[in-house]
Structure formats: structure tokens, C-alpha cells
Amino acid sequence: MTKEDSFEMHGTVLDTLPNTMFRVKLENGHVIVAHISGKIRKNYIRILTGDKVTVELTPYDLSKGRIIFRSR
């Protein structure tokens, strides 16, 4: 899968799940489950409930995503 196949959306973290998974509510109202990307994990960036995040989704499964950026 190439980077062009995925698209980004903004959302808010609703709650934290085990294994660095998060429930995220997107701007369009959908609720998805997202994990954190490797760069966020490597740099020990903490993601808490209520944080604004950017999520990368694939067209194959719109219920799962990857958190690629945490807004301040």
C-alpha cells in the first residue's frame, strides 16, 4: 500500500485502550480505534484523553487508523 492510498482526518481521543490503542472521535462524528505510529512511539510522545490528533486511514478498513500527529 502506498502513501497515496491513505488519507488523513482530525479527531479527539475519547479513551485509552490496552496495547497503545485509542478510541478516537473524528470530525465527521465517526468513532474509530487507532494505534500510534512508530515515530510517536520511538520519541515517547504521550497521548492522553482529550488530545487533538491527526489520524491516517486506509480506504480498506475505515474503522481502524494510525495516529500520526498530536496537536498541542
Curated annotation (Swiss-Prot):
InterPro entries tied to this protein: NA-bd_OB-fold, RNA-binding_domain_S1_IF1, S1_domain, TIF_IF1
Keyword S-adenosyl-L-methionine: no
Pfam families hit by this protein: eIF-1a (PF01176)
Keywords annotated in UniProt: Cytoplasm, Initiation factor, Protein biosynthesis, RNA-binding, rRNA-binding
CDD domains: S1_IF1
An example Gene Ontology CC term for this record: cytosol
UniProt main location, coarse: cytoplasm
Location within or outside the cell: Cytoplasm
Residue span(s) of domain S1-like: 1-72
Gene3D superfamilies cross-referenced by the UniProt entry: Nucleic acid-binding proteins
PROSITE patterns: S1_IF1_TYPE
Assembly information from the UniProt record: Component of the 30S ribosomal translation pre-initiation complex which assembles on the 30S ribosome in the order IF-2 and IF-3, IF-1 and N-formylmethionyl-tRNA(fMet); mRNA recruitment can occur at any time during PIC assembly.
HAMAP family xrefs: IF_1
Similarity-based family: Belongs to the IF-1 family.
Name used for this protein in its record: Translation initiation factor IF-1
Annotated organism of origin: Blochmanniella pennsylvanica (strain BPEN)
